[in-house]
Amino acid sequence: MDRIIEKLDRGWWIVSHEQKLWLPAGELPHGDAEQFDLVGQPALKIGEWQGDAVWLIQQNRRQDMGSVRQVMDLDAGLFQLAGRGVQLAEFYRSHKFCGYCGHAMHPSKTEWALLCSHCRERYYPQIAPCIIVAIRRDDSILLAQHVRHRNGIHTVLAGFVEVGETLEQTVAREVMEESGIKVKNLRYVTSQPWPFPMSLMTAFMADYDSGDIVIDPKELLEANWYRYDDLPLLPPPGTVARRLIEDTVAMCRADYEV
C-alpha cells in the first residue's frame, strides 16, 4: 500500500499535515507527480476517482495549507476521499508509538491499521459516531444557532453518541439537553463521513412530541420554529444538515401547498 512516488505517477494528491490539506491555487492538486514536486515522496493509495489514483502524502508544505472545508464543493465522492486522507494522516501522526508498550508502530500492508511489532497490539482509526436530526412540527422546522457558529447560520440539532448508547437514545438525549423538547416518529435518513475531526454523521428526521423550547446556553445561542417558506441562513449545500432541512421543506410543501 505504501510506496515511493515516481516521475510517471499521476492522480489526485492529498498532501496533509495536522488536519490541514495542501490546496495550491485553492484547489485539490490533480495531475502528474512531477508537476507538483512530489517525486520521491512516500505515498499511500487510498482510492480512485474518475479513473485516477488518489494518493495520500503526509507532508507539511510551507504555503497553501488549508482546511478540508475549502473543498466541500467538490463532488461528494472526491470530498469523501479527501476527508479519508486527512483523517488517515492524522491517525498515523498521532499513533507513532504503541500506547501499551511505547515501541514504534508500523502500518499494516492489508488494512487501515497500525501494528506494534513488540507486543502485537493493533490500532485502527477512531471514528466518533454522531447523530443529526431535523425536527418538524406541522409546517415548521426546529433550527438553532450554535455557540461555535457565530456566522448567522441556523441548522438542525446534532451531538455525539455516548458510550453504551443507541443512536435512538442519543437523539432523545441530545434534543432534550439542547432544546428541552421531546420527539417521536424517528426515521433514519442517511449517513455522511465528516472529517471534523473524525466523525460519522447519522442523519434522522423526527416529529415534535411535547415540551417548550428551553435552550442550553453552553451549546446554543438561540433556537426556534421556522415556517418552511421563511427560513434563516442555512448550512451550505453538500452538508447532511442541508439535506435534512431540504427534505423537511419538501414534505411541508407536499402537505401545505395543495
Swiss-Prot record:
GO cellular component entries: cytosol
GO function terms (MF aspect): magnesium ion binding; manganese ion binding; NAD+ diphosphatase activity; NADH pyrophosphatase activity; RNA NAD-cap (NMN-forming) hydrolase activity; zinc ion binding
Coiled coil: none
Annotated cofactor note: Divalent metal cations. Mg(2+) or Mn(2+).
Binding-site residues, a divalent metal cation 1: 158, 178, 219
InterPro entries, per database record: NAD-cap_RNA_hydrolase_NudC (IPR050241), NudC-like_C (IPR049734), NUDIX_hydrolase-like_dom_sf (IPR015797), NUDIX_hydrolase_CS (IPR020084), NUDIX_hydrolase_dom (IPR000086), RNA_Hydrolase_NudC (IPR022925), Znr_NADH_PPase (IPR015376)
Entry-linked PROSITE patterns: NUDIX, NUDIX_BOX
Keywords of this entry: Hydrolase, Magnesium, Manganese, Metal-binding, NAD, Zinc
Superkingdom: Bacteria
Gene Ontology annotations of biological process type: NAD catabolic process; NADH metabolic process; NADP catabolic process
Location of the motif Nudix box: 159-180
Residue positions binding substrate: 69, 111, 124, 192-199, 241
Residues where a divalent metal cation 3 binds: 174, 178, 219
Residues where a divalent metal cation 2 binds: 174
Ligand binding (Zn(2+)): 98, 101, 116, 119
Top-level enzyme category: hydrolase
Entry EC number(s): 3.6.1.-, 3.6.1.22
Cofactor(s) essential for the protein: Mg(2+); Mn(2+); Zn(2+)
Domain Nudix hydrolase positions: 125-248
Biological function: mRNA decapping enzyme that specifically removes the nicotinamide adenine dinucleotide (NAD) cap from a subset of mRNAs by hydrolyzing the diphosphate linkage to produce nicotinamide mononucleotide (NMN) and 5' monophosphate mRNA. The NAD-cap is present at the 5'-end of some mRNAs and stabilizes RNA against 5'-processing. Has preference for mRNAs with a 5'-end purine. Catalyzes the hydrolysis of a broad range of dinucleotide pyrophosphates.
Subunit comment: Homodimer.
Full protein name: NAD-capped RNA hydrolase NudC
Organism: Enterobacter sp. (strain 638)
